[in-house]
Swiss-Prot record:
Comp. bias intervals (Low complexity): 58-73
Keyword flag Repeat: yes
Disruption phenotype: Male mice are infertile, while female fertility is not affected. Spermatozoa exhibit multiple morphologic abnormalities including short, thick, and/or coiled flagella, whereas sperm heads conserve an overall typical hooked shape.
One GO-annotated biological process of the protein: flagellated sperm motility
Biased amino acid composition, Polar residues: 74-87, 162-187
Name of the protein in its database record: Armadillo repeat-containing protein 2
Keywords on record: Differentiation, Repeat, Spermatogenesis
Region (Disordered): 1-116, 140-194, 206-255
Function summary: Required for sperm flagellum axoneme organization and function. Involved in axonemal central pair complex assembly and/or stability.
ARM repeats: 255-294, 298-337, 356-396, 401-442, 455-496, 499-540, 544-583, 585-605, 606-649, 651-692, 694-733, 735-777
SUPFAM superfamilies reported in the protein's UniProt record: ARM repeat
Length: 854
């Protein structure tokens, strides 16, 4: 006789899925999500690597005549000297009230000469040799003097060739007295380039004074001179003029120091470049020149001899050597050229970067820093074309793994993001795009697309809040397919990561933007597939994204229109040869991504029932299953079944699937006869939802599906065992069908699942206990119901698993441990306790006596 507690247990109904209207705990929601609703994953669309490095690849929407060229010729004559004039830092002297008499020819300026007139073109044509031609032309008056003297044009400056007098405290150079504490003997130095068509010898005194003169003479005197200047409020007009003259004299001294440094240190290197024939030696000389100028702080625009130096560097471009040109370009950029020269040097680097073999060369020369400095320091509006080729070079090298980390560490992400922000703000301000800004944005977004492979890039973009700016670019340039495709590729990569996906999902304007682009580019597979992939990522990870997307007008209709269009394209295309099958495969890939979005948004409790009641949605999904053979487009079939599975979860009267449930079950039967376990798993999941209906259960019994479910319990695959057990649970709700568990050793296989997966999967353990509970509803003897061995095994397993210390003594991290405890306490424990009590109350440890023989 059963106790009162046992009688109460016996009155419990069979386990089945609770009605949707019943309030559920969080554990039940998680469990149901595993049973019926789940998001669908898919691969990111493949972007093939372009064979050639060009500004715009073969897939570009720009016609060749409407885009900047990737191939061009570049020579020394392409550069301009007008840009090379240095910025003067000299302060003008106050005007003297009394006129001064003209200086005599013997005064300090007598050594200077006026600039010579340009050479006769006929003479220039007679000069042969690239480098020799430059240096002869440079020495015949092309090197501009510091000041304009009254002397004759062709007169050689005598004072410039005189040695510094030994023992004198003053060294006279070009008519200017330079202070020096001492000077020692005279030794030969490398020849110097002078303004009278030749090189001259330099004395050691000139070289020995450099270090002191570069510091401005005697430090004590400089400090005394500086400290002796009174405040401006106390100066009389006379004192002001005196102070101004003192400052001017100091600047003149610095100028003369630069002149000595130029002749002693720079000209010898230029002389070497003139006479050297070996490219490696010329590269070494360029490196030495760059280092020397950097040490002397002569880089930038204020160097007086900058014009002469730049002209020398421009001439060397004709050597047509990538290693040499790269070093020249780096030095020219360091001299802060602008205008056409900046454009040409960026073109020069772009030209070099087109050859992938030069990547190592560019990395060794650290050209990245120079390119990024152009983008960081120069003005965008006046240098858009230069930025274009600069960014093109960065795009090429950013695709090389060796440059990725270096570019990110050097601030490339911040520079690109700021550039994008600046262009979007200018467009918003003026209402029109800057000239060539579209071309520049193509290169910028393509570069950023390569950089987002770095985790540090993703972190920086999140911290900068760059996603809205990228969306704004797509809005402003919606007619530019190249820009939209690049940004779609960026978001395709970023939304594959949870934090980036959440950031974009929270930007509510993105959904209307994506839908607008889908409607605009319906026939452009390359763009459509990426936007749909992004929407699939957003709706897979965020219920808010499902809600926001579904609220947009025409959201579902847009998906269905695309689905129907690409479905017809796929179905109406004849069977193609392997080489011609690419468009057909791309159409299938779009359908894969579209079914994924439908499956994901169906998880939302408000959207799911609406989709299930939409005949067009269900019709397209079923038509896909009808037309696909088992060997055709594996992923599309699986995603379609997953979408049907999520829709079949909603047991509402308006559901089209509920009205066609038997037809759906028949379609799914053929998927069970497959070697693909993923297909089988998806089909079994749908049966788990459909088998809640009595008619479907009868259909499954007629087709012996229950036997297949019992066989699947041996799969040793948790998800397959879970889904198969769910179908058996629904079948055993009917008392007449409970005996099926005895077929094929079903009871023992269920107990084996409990033993194998229980400690790691309390949801599966709960499902097994529910199925055994249904099976044993009319139990009178545990041994007769389960068998002696199975009953004893059940008693041991249930007793062990109900011991909290033993059951939850797993090596899990804190979050996973909390998850396991939640399911153990709320799902497994209540059912297991009931089942254990039932077995114990109907189980005797006494062995029956043998029947005596007479």
């Amino acid at each position: 006789m059963l106790s009162s507690n046992d009688q109460k247990l016996e009155k419990l109904d069979s386990f089945y899925r609770p009605p949707v209207s019943k309030q559920r705990t969080s554990a039940e929601i998680i469990s149901e999500a595993r049973n019926a609703l789940r998001t669908v994953r898919t691969q990111r669309p493949f972007t093939p690597r372009e064979d050639q490095r060009k500004l715009f690849g073969p897939a570009s929407s720009r016609s060749p005549e409407n885009r900047p060229p990737s191939s061009f010729s570049l020579h020394a004559s392409s550069f301009e000297l007008s840009d090379s004039k240095p910025i003067s830092g000299t302060r003008l002297r106050p005007l003297e009230l009394k006129p001064k008499a003209p200086a005599s020819p013997g005064t300090e300026d007598a050594c200077l000469s006026f600039p010579k007139a340009p050479l006769d073109p006929a003479k220039i044509r007679k000069i042969s040799g690239a480098r020799a031609r430059f240096y002869r032309a440079a020495s015949q008056g092309m090197l501009l003097p510091d000041r304009s003297p009254p002397a004759a044009h062709s007169k050689t400056v005598d004072e410039s060739s005189k040695p510094v007098s030994v023992g004198s405290s003053t060294a006279r150079r070009n008519g200017t007295h330079l202070t020096a504490s001492s000077a020692t003997g005279q030794l030969k130095s490398p020849p110097l380039l002078t303004c009278d068509q030749g090189f001259q010898e330099t004395t050691e005194q000139e070289v020995s004074l450099l270090s002191q003169l570069r510091r401005g003479g005697d430090p004590g005197k400089r400090r005394a001179r500086a400290s002796s200047c009174p405040s401006s409020s106390d100066l009389s007009r006379k004192e002001t003029r005196a102070a101004s003259r003192a400052s001017s004299q100091e600047q003149e001294t610095d100028t003369e120091v630069d002149e000595v440094f130029w002749k002693a240190r720079i000209v010898p290197i230029l002389h070497e470049l003139e006479n050297e024939e070996d490219i490696e030696e010329m590269c070494a000389a360029c490196t030495q020149l760059h280092r020397t100028l950097e040490e002397a702080r002569m880089l930038g625009k204020k160097f007086k001899r900058r014009t002469v130096l730049l002209k020398a560097l421009y001439k060397l471009v004709d050597a047509d050597s990538d290693p040499l040109s790269l070093k020249l370009a780096k030095l020219i950029l360091a001299l802060k050229v602008s205008g056409k020269n900046l454009l040409n040097v960026c073109k020069l680097i772009f030209k070099i970067s087109r050859n992938e073999k030069n990547d190592t060369l560019m990395q060794e020369d650290n050209i990245l820093e120079s390119l990024l400095e152009v983008l960081r320091a120069e003005e965008l509006q006046s240098n858009t074309e230069a930025f274009l080729y600069c960014m093109g070079a960065l795009k090429f090298v950013s695709g090389s793994p060796g440059f990725l980390t270096e570019m990110v560490n050097k601030g490339a992400v911040e520079i690109l993001a700021q550039l994008i922000k600046e262009m979007t703000e200018d467009t918003e301000k003026h209402g029109v795009c800057l000239p060539d800004s579209g071309h520049l944005l193509v290169q910028t977004t393509a570069t950023l697309r390569n950089l987002v492979d770095s985790p540090l890039t993703r972190s920086k973009l999140l911290n900068m809040g760059a996603f809205p700016h990228l969306c704004t670019v797509m809005e402003q340039h919606a007619d530019d397919k190249d820009i939209c495709t690049n940004i779609a590729r960026i978001f395709s990569k970023l939304t594959s990561y949870r934090d980036c996906c959440a950031a974009l999902a929270s930007y509510s304007r993105c959904y209307a933007l994506f839908l607008s682009l889908l409607n605009k580019y319906q026939k452009n597979q390359d763009l459509v597939i990426r936007i749909v992939f992004i929407l699939g990522n957003l709706t897979a990870k965020s219920n808010q994204a499902r809600e926001l997307f579904s609220r947009e007008t025409g959201s579902v209709e847009t998906l269905l229109t695309l689905f129907q269009s690409f479905y017809h394209h796929k179905e109406n295309s004849p069977k193609l040869q392997l080489s011609e099958a690419k468009p057909q495969a791309e159409a299938e890939d779009v359908l894969v991504k579209l079914t994924r979005v439908l499956a994901n948004i169906a998880i939302h409790p408000r959207i799911g029932p609406v989709l299930a009641a939409n005949p067009r949605v269900v019709g397209l999904l079923l038509r896909t299953l009808e037309s696909k053979s088992l060997g055709d487009c594996e992923e599309l079939v699986i995603n379609t079944i997953a979408a049907i599975n999520n829709l079949s979860f909603y047991q509402v009267k308006s559901s089209v699937l509920q009205h066609r449930k038997l037809y759906v079950a028949e379609l799914l039967l053929r998927l069970l006869v497959s070697n693909n376990m993923e297909r089988i798993l998806e089909a079994v999941r749908v049966f788990g939802n459909l088998s809640q209906d009595h008619d479907v259960c009868n259909f499954l019994m007629q087709k012996n599906v229950h036997k297949f479910m019992i066989t699947l319990l041996e799969a040793k695959h948790q998800d397959i065992c879970f889904s198969a057990c769910g179908v058996l649970l629904n079948l055993t709700v009917d008392k007449e069908k409970r005996a099926i568990l005895k077929e094929g050793g079903g009871i023992k296989k269920l107990v084996d699942c409990l033993r194998d997966f229980g400690p790691s999967d309390w949801q599966l353990a709960c499902l097994v206990c529910k199925t055994l509970w249904n099976f044993s509803e009319n139990i009178t003897n545990a041994s007769e119901c389960f068998g002696d061995d199975v009953a004893n095994t059940l008693l041991i397993l249930l007793s062990t698993f109900l011991d909290e210390e033993l059951a939850l003594n797993g090596s899990f991290d804190q979050d996973l441990e909390s998850y396991h405890r939640l399911h153990w306490e709320t799902e497994f424990k209540p059912v297991a306790q009931q089942l254990l009590q039932r077995i114990q109350s109907h189980h005797s440890l006494l062995e029956p006596l043998p029947v005596p023989s007479f």
